[in-house]
Amino acid sequence: MKNIANHKAVAMIELIFAIVIMAIALMSAPMLIHQSIKSSFVGMQQESINTLSSHISLILTKEWDEVNADTQFNPSILVVDGGDDKLGIKNDNRYRAGTFNPSQRTFASDEGGNAKKASLTSNFGENVDGTEKFNDIDDYDGNKAVVSIFGDTTSTGSDYIDNQIEMTTTVRYGGDSTDSGDYNSDSTIVFNHPFNETLNTSTNIKLISVQLTTKNEATELSKNIRLSAFACNIGNYSLSIRDL
């Protein structure tokens, strides 16, 4: 007669532990999926912001005004109609207050000595003034750029989720007066937020705003993001050629 040894139920206990651990892991799965989806949305928002930033950076590489883009003039300071008086011409050398002498940053003038003025807002926009397109900042006013894949504006037939991405650019003049302090005599000034005040007359500040929108049936995928920047009427340096 054989004696059968009694075995402890170790295997059963291990099975129970395994089931409990798997249950805990599965309970966290929905939360992990939710966080993964949110991370994807954040990633697409960051891509949109990066696209906006690149577009604004491109605009800021252009000349401040159409007059600056004219090759017969150095990219110098322009006279404005509605700017702060303390930022105007201060002496016969056509310097602005605070500019060292000598400097290329002088007010531009034509051959007759007449000061060159910044463009009117009525001349803002693509090819409005009849000159080369997109050679200065205000040419981008009203420009609507469509981001697409290989020319497909709807991205149909691709696996790209974001589609119908549009970037609309607005360029305006902004107030350049200080809230407190003096440009010429004070070491500290408090400056008004220029985007709170857009003007139809020319000033020393151009405000650039680019708004990105997407059209998507899913609410969480629709975007309406705006980035802004400004550029000042401060002229530019020009390279000198030394005779050897």
Please place each PLM-identified region on the residue numbering.
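N-terminal single-pass transmembrane signal-anchor helix
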Residues: 2-36, 48
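Flexible, low-complexity segments enriched in proline/glycine/serine and punctuated by aromatic residues
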Residues: 16-20, 37-46, 53-244
